[in-house]
Structure formats: C-alpha cells, structure tokens
C-alpha cells in the first residue's frame, strides 16, 4: 500500500515538475519574441528618447565582494547613450537599501558622474526594488510616456514585456543592451527563467488589483 502511494506521489511530483519546466520555457519564448526589433546592441540603431531608464544593480558581487561586471557594463551603456546624444536624462532606478547595504541608485550616480555625466541630468528612483516597480515608477511617479531601458539583453527583454503589458500609457519604449559578462554563472540563467515565470504572475495580480 505504501509503495503504491509513494509511486503515485513520485508521478505527481514528476508531472508537476515537467509542467513547470514547460511553462517556464513557454514564458521565456514569449518574452524573447515580444522583444524582437525593440532591443538594440548598436548605438546607431537606437532611436532618440529624452530619458534613459537605467536598471539598478550593486557595484560589487554579493559573494566574494568582487567588482560586478553587470554594474560596470550598464554604466558604460548609459554613458554611451548620453554622449551619443541618444538620451538627455538618466533615470537610475534601483533599491536604496540593496544587498550588502548598497544604495544602488547612489552608487550608479557616482559612477556616471565619474564617467563625465553631469549630475544635473541624473534622476534617482530609490524605490525600484524590482524591475516591475522600476517600470511602473517611470510612468506613474515620473510621468514618462516613453524611455530607453538600459540593462543586459535578458533583463531588457523582461522589462520591455512588463512595460508593454502593465496597461500603462506608454509609447516608444525601447531598450539598449549593455554588454554581458563573458563569464556568467549558470545561476543567472536559472534565476532569469524563474523571474520570467514570476513576471506573468505579477502581471496577472497587477491586473486584478487594478480592476
């Protein structure tokens, strides 16, 4: 009897796991397809937008306290856009009390200034604790109807989908892809798959709460 119950439990767990993996794969494909023609890696391909939305991260890794390449490359991308006159203002959105005690927007602001971006064109949003909040705040708090998202491509794809499916009054949102680190931990990919699955749940809950 116990063996039969155990077998049934294993089958149910296996089925649930397989269904979850399939669902995550489908979510990933939907996000990638939606971003086609809207994310750009070449500076000449990007259109002018007054504001660039720079998505926050910490300057040093949580483990090992090493320089965070994701941070460095996002700063470089934002500086490139500003110096190429593709944006006039940089809205830095992240957690003001991020991991390891870092204030993400302030850290990014300091790095942008060090790279020659004037302080007066940098706006901080310390309430961007998650990507979906950064997108919502850009529209609802800062009144932006269009902007250029700045992050790594996988992050941009998810942010674009959120921007277009939150029911916000947006037009002309695009994304500029920061360089991605050569050595990427596989956990980054796993986390992104999970984040894309969670994103659809977030969008559903946001829609329900908005009605």
Give names to the regions the model predicted.
Residues 29-189:
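A structural signal for short, hydrophobic/glycine-enriched beta-strand patches
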Residues 186-209:
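A transmembrane-helix-recognition feature enriched in membrane-embedded lipid enzymes
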């Amino acid at each position: 009897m116990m063996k039969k119950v155990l077998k049934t439990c294993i089958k149910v767990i296996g089925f649930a796991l397989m269904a979850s993996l399939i669902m995550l794969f489908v979510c990933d494909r939907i996000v990638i397809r939606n971003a086609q023609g809207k994310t750009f890696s070449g500076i000449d391909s990007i259109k002018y937008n007054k504001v660039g939305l720079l998505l926050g991260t910490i300057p040093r890794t949580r483990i090992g306290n090493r320089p965070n390449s994701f941070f460095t490359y996002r700063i470089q991308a934002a500086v490139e856009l500003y110096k190429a006159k593709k944006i006039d203002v940089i809205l830095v959105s992240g957690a003001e009390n991020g991991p390891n005690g870092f204030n993400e927007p302030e850290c990014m602001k300091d790095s942008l200034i060090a790279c020659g971006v004037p302080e007066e064109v940098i706006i901080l949003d310390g309430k961007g604790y998650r990507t979906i909040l950064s997108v919502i705040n850009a529209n609802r708090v800062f009144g932006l109807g269009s902007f250029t998202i700045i992050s790594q491509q996988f992050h941009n794809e998810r942010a674009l989908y959120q921007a277009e499916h939150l029911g916000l009054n947006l037009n002309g949102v695009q994304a500029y892809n920061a360089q991605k680190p050569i050595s990427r931990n596989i956990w980054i990919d796993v986390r992104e798959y999970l984040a894309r699955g969670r994103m659809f749940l977030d969008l559903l809950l946001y829609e329900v709460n908005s009605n």
